[in-house]
Amino acid sequence: MTDILNKILATKAQEVAAQKAAVNAEHIRALAAEAAPVRSFIDSIRGKHRLNLPAVIAEIKKASPSKGLIRPDFRPAEIARAYENAGAACLSVLTDEPYFQGSPEYLKQAREAVLLPVLRKDFIIDEYQVYQARAWGADAVLLIAAALEQGQLERFEALAHELGMTVLLELHDETELEKCRNLTTPLRGVNNRNLRTFEVSLDQTLSLLPALEGKTVVTESGITGKADVEFMRARGVHTFLIGETFMRADDIGAEVGKLF
């Protein structure tokens, strides 16, 4: 299969260059400084854990490269409210347009509709995008180890923390652990979907658990219902990033409620 991640990153580099030309770095930094106060993403997750509940990072996603259009009837504010009312800890909103049909407007609409903290879900390759995330109102950013070098990971994490945001560090396998050794974020996501082939296996999370002892592990992709949640919780994983299962449901709130 074509290396999907490299294709996405090449497109992203062109996209960021165009965005910088439209809104220069100085302006985006000023917008970030003026953004609404940050809501604590990590505290919201820990609040669920203190209640002995699974912490669900509920994703707002219209489409994906592997599945195409997932939710034709796509209204971010309504989806966000359904998630909040059903007990989600946080939101994740796709802002990548070419591959996921996302938009910064979706992030803004979702955040304005609820009190939950919101993650910008995108492929961050430049510190400009970290400022951009805060300018749009994001409370957290995703950093993908497979997409970045060690120095980039460390710089982008430091900048996100300087701006008050939580970092969700996404890992996929043992080879990525070494370049993340200096990162301080407690939130470590394990993507059960291989970003190079898009195949899914929950074993990805289980294989990395011993190396992530003491961290708040987020299992991402492939969680389809309560059985998967209970399976992971029995093994010490209590935080779940779930998108497609919810996005395909007629009643999103009811689908989230099935996990509790």
UniProtKB/Swiss-Prot annotation:
Name used for this protein in its record: Indole-3-glycerol phosphate synthase
Source organism phylogeny: Bacteria, Pseudomonadati, Pseudomonadota, Betaproteobacteria, Neisseriales
CDD domains: IGPS (cd00331)
Reactions catalysed: 1-(2-carboxyphenylamino)-1-deoxy-D-ribulose 5-phosphate + H(+) = (1S,2R)-1-C-(indol-3-yl)glycerol 3-phosphate + CO2 + H2O
Pfam families from the UniProt entry: IGPS
Pathway: Amino-acid biosynthesis; L-tryptophan biosynthesis; L-tryptophan from chorismate: step 4/5
Domain of life per record: Bacteria
Enzyme class, first EC level, given as a word: lyase
Family: Belongs to the TrpC family.
Family matches, as InterPro entries: Aldolase_TIM, Indole-3-glycerol_P_synth, Indole-3-glycerol_P_synth_dom, Indole-3-GlycerolPSynthase_CS, RibuloseP-bd_barrel
Keywords: Amino-acid biosynthesis, Aromatic amino acid biosynthesis, Decarboxylase, Lyase, Tryptophan biosynthesis
GO terms under biological process: L-tryptophan biosynthetic process
Molecular function as annotated in GO: indole-3-glycerol-phosphate synthase activity; phosphoribosylanthranilate isomerase activity
E.C. no: 4.1.1.48
SUPFAM superfamilies xref list: Ribulose-phoshate binding barrel
NCBIfam families in the record: PRK00278.1-6, PRK00278.2-4
Protein species of origin: Neisseria gonorrhoeae (strain NCCP11945)
